Amino acid sequence: MEQMEMDESRGGTGLRQYYLSKIEDLQLVVNDKSQNLRRLQAQRNELNAKVRLLREELQLLQEQGSYVGEVVRAMDKKKVLVKVHPEGKFVVDVDKNIDINDVTPNCRVALRNDSYTLHKILPNKVDPLVSLMMVEKVPDSTYEMIGGLDKQIKEIKEVIELPVKHPEHFEALGIAQPKGVLLYGPPGTGKTLLARAVAHHTDCTFIRVSGSELVQKFIGEGARMVRELFVMAREHAPSIIFMDEIDSIGSRLEGGSGGDSEVQRTMLELLNQLDGFEATKNIKVIMATNRIDILDSALLRPGRIDRKIEFPPPNEEARLDILKIHSRKMNLTRGINLRKIAELMPGASGAEVKGVCTEAGMYALRERRVHVTQEDFEMAVAKVMQKDSEKNMSIKKLWKCFFLVPILCSTVCFQLKPSDVYYMGAWLIKPTRFNRRIITNSYHLQIFKPTIVLANGECHN
């Protein structure tokens, strides 16, 4: 009996193990089928989404085309005046799904082909080249960074900054706000720097465009860019349009080739935009040029350009102010006479004065010094002002580096060779030209008078 019971228990255990293994196998099959089902459902959803997109696209393709127009003004709550090119202007109805408050002048709209009903507001079309002209970051230039232009700063504040910040003053006086200003003068006198400072202090959108960017080879492209430029300025008002090198498109209208005709069309569109936009739209135009003599008189008349500001070369006091501004953060030695440096640069522009400070720092860097000396400034002035390269060294440097002991004879004849080096009785440096020279020391009785030798072998007492 006991043997039979043991056999039965063993048989039951084996049967249980068999069914458990079968159950595990079936669970694996069910899990596999479930994963396949989820994958197929995901694929079905993806295909359904594509089908919906294709149906919507097909529906749009089957619809009739719409006319594109530009809103002139709203007539009432249900009708607006729209300009459609080239048909003309039409008074159209507004679809019930469109809010009349969103329909603003100069916005692009879509009109139904059959009923001319306004059924969609379109985004304004702006050329990517035009949108890149807008400077996203406010310029960091300030009036304190401009030296010697106090009169010009005061005049541009009255024309640009005051109308933007305090338009009520003009309304109280009953006068129209100025539209634009022209900055003219030699290159490097601070025209662009002052325009950037105005944009910084007025907190306006700064749109910078060069006149050469508006010169296109295809007919009508330059005029279209001018139109889109002012459209973008209206969208981001208050804004300042700074047009540098305006003489490239604003020259006098004269007969010429086809390229000149395209430039003239671009200028005519610019004149149209200057006459078209209202001054109260907080759009100000600043133009800069160094050739005011070739600009067309139609561009310079009041109403388009209300003020012309001259930027002359800085005088001595202005050069001193510019030197102080640009040397403010430089590590200078004591006793540097900036006024003397300013006196050494007659007729220099502001950019050249700044270049002197940079070049002086480069001389100090070349000698591995952490400070700038008076001699560095003197050599920088000689280099920036384009003097003789053989004289681009101060007298003190020459005294330290290139001198000979007094020659006690009145006349000495010698032949310079590449290997000759003379210092205290020998050559100091290798000369660049090897000619036969005659050194005449007419002051041979003055024992301690040095004879200076330059790099080309010339000797001076």
From Swiss-Prot:
InterPro entries named among the record's database cross-references: 26S_Proteasome_ATPase (IPR050221), AAA+_ATPase (IPR003593), AAA_lid_3 (IPR041569), ATPase_AAA_core (IPR003959), ATPase_AAA_CS (IPR003960), NA-bd_OB-fold (IPR012340), P-loop_NTPase (IPR027417), Prot_ATP_ID_OB_2nd (IPR032501)
Cross-referenced PROSITE patterns: AAA
Name of the protein described by the UniProt record: 26S proteasome regulatory subunit 8
Entry function: The 26S proteasome is involved in the ATP-dependent degradation of ubiquitinated proteins. The regulatory (or ATPase) complex confers ATP dependency and substrate specificity to the 26S complex.
Keywords linked to the UniProt accession: ATP-binding, Cytoplasm, Nucleotide-binding, Nucleus, Proteasome
Keyword flag ATP-binding: yes
CC terms in the record's Gene Ontology section: cytoplasm; nucleus; proteasome accessory complex; proteasome regulatory particle, base subcomplex
Any Pfam family matching the protein: Prot_ATP_ID_OB_C
Record SMART domains: AAA (SM00382)
Source organism of the structure: Xenopus laevis (African clawed frog)
Keyword Chaperone: no
Annotated binding of ATP, by residue: G185, P186, P187, G188, T189, G190, K191, T192
One of the record's GO molecular function terms: ATP binding
